[in-house]
Regions:
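Conserved N-terminal structural module of periplasmic/extracytoplasmic solute-binding proteins
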Residues: 17-124, 298, 321-322, 338, ...
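Hinge/lid segment of periplasmic solute-binding proteins
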Residues: 48, 119-170, 180, 185-189, ...
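Extracytoplasmic/periplasmic substrate-recognition and gating elements
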Residues: 54, 77, 81, 245-248, ...
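Extracytoplasmic "Venus flytrap"/periplasmic binding protein-like
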Residues: 75-145, 154, 160, 176, ...
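A structural signal for short loop-to-beta-strand junctions that line the ligand-binding cleft
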Residues: 104-105, 112-113, 141-173, 197, ...
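Periplasmic solute-binding protein
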Residues: 123-130, 147-183, 202-222, 305-313, ...
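Glycine-centered hinge/linker elements that transmit conformational signals in sensory
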Residues: 192, 223-253
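Conserved C-terminal helix/tail region of periplasmic/extracytoplasmic solute-binding proteins
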Residues: 368-412
């Protein structure tokens, strides 16, 4: 059973304290994103001729032109001046490719010095020695970082990344079209049945929070899959199927990417998505944008997975100290304030002051029921066996039968 997060922030936060930038003797060129090559060579050694900057290769997966990419680019331009001892080579890799590309290149002895990504698979990557243990390297350097962020980058007492922000799925709505968001799953269904378009995001990641809301569990305390015990998971899948059929009948979108246009153009009154999209929504809707927790079910709050984004380091790299310096710069109080205000990131630092009601709304939503993402190997059983909901939504398999089949397959 995943552990529910009770209090994320006593981070309602102390005075904003931007970390002091190092003195820059001369301005350097801003790092530019490049297209991803088929493979990369092993990172270059830290030793560089006197007076020449050490090269640090950095990958990210922020979408082209997104608020996240724009904010990161501004930070990297500033870093080029504030950290003249480093030349930061930036590579943008599509999100769907970044993990596989990183693993393939690292296994071949190459890869970047570091990359930023959610802690989606930190546990498996750490167990496979694909990311570096930085416990000693980062010792004493995370002052001001909330323990939740550190925990999200930690496995078995070892630190594998520098935390940057918190992310989870929430309910975004247009106040000019929907003054009050649905507080319950019944209210959400009634809203959609009334013909008001909701860009509901379907998929096993987005579905996860609804199982608890209907009293279901995927795992017991021993990590055995127990989704077929009781009716909670089946009831949740049946409910999600009801919403899917409403969306299908009305020709509404069914994923967060396709839902961007109808929501930002004012056709959809709401969308379910993570706070990585806040910047894009805010740019389009301005003061009409609001956020709330996912609607609660008959058994209690929805419990979406709470992820931690962070910087991971390549065990092949001979530039880990340089990469760490860059990562610490990109996660200091000033940098996190910029990512918060411009890209909607929820900071992991306790010395960042929240002034945006949307960020505070996310904090409140996360506190309502978000669940810390576990880094256990057994989580793979969920992704492998519970992501094929099209068998219910499109092929018409009864929810109870589908849950039973998925559970049996997971426990083989």
């Amino acid at each position: 059973m995943l552990f529910s997060l009770l209090v994320i922030f006593s981070m309602a936060l102390s005075a904003c304290g931007g970390a002091a930038a190092t003195e820059a003797p001369a301005s350097t060129e801003a790092p530019a994103a490049t297209e991803a090559p088929a493979s990369t060579e092993a990172p270059a050694a830290t030793e560089a001729p006197v007076g020449e900057p050490v090269e640090v290769t950095f990958w990210h997966a922020y979408g082209t032109g997104s608020a996240e990419e724009v904010a990161l680019t501004s930070l990297l331009e500033k870093a080029a001046t504030d950290l003249p001892q480093y030349k930061i080579n930036v590579l943008q890799v599509p999100f769907n490719d970044i993990f596989n590309k990183y693993r393939t290149d690292v296994a071949a002895g190459g890869g970047p010095d570091m990359f930023i990504a959610p802690n989606d698979d930190l546990g498996n990557d750490a167990r496979a020695s694909l990311i570096a243990d930085i416990t000693d390297l980062a010792a004493g350097k995370l002052e001001g970082v909330n323990q939740l962020g550190i925990d999200g980058m930690t496995l078995d007492g070892k630190l594998y990344g520098i935390p940057e922000s918190l992310k989870a799925v929430a309910f975004w709505y247009n106040k000019s079209l929907l003054p009050t968001p649905p507080a319950t799953t019944d209210e959400l269904k009634a809203l959609m049945e009334s013909g008001q378009e909701v860009a509901f995001s379907f998929g096993c990641y987005h579905h996860y929070g609804f199982f608890d809301a209907f009293g279901g569990e995927i795992f017991d305390d021993n990590r055995t899959v127990v989704a077929d015990q009781g009716t909670g998971v089946t009831d949740a899948v049946s409910y999600l199927n009801d919403l899917y059929q409403i969306s299908k009948t009305n020709g509404w979108t069914k994923n967060d990417a396709d839902g961007l246009a109808p929501f930002t153009e004012g056709r959809a009154v709401a969308i379910t998505n993570g706070n990585w999209a806040l910047g894009d929504y805010k740019n389009a809707l301005g003061d009409d944008l609001a956020v709330a927790p996912l609607p609660a079910g008959p058994a209690g709050p929805a419990t979406p997975m709470l992820g931690v984004d962070g910087f991971y380091f390549n065990p092949n790299s001979t530039n880990q100290e340089a990469a760490l310096d860059v990562a610490l710069y990109l996660t200091n109080a000033e940098s996190q304030t910029i990512m918060m205000n411009e890209a909607g990131h929820v900071p992991v630092r306790t010395d960042v002051t929240i002034t945006d009601p949307l960020i505070q709304g996310l904090v409140d939503a996360f506190n309502t029921g978000a669940t810390i993402r576990p880094q256990v190997a057994e989580l793979g059983k969920y992704w492998t066996n519970f992501c094929g909901t099209d068998q219910v939504f499109e092929a018409g398999t009864p929810a109870e039968e589908w849950v039973k089949t998925a559970t049996e397959a997971a426990n083989k």
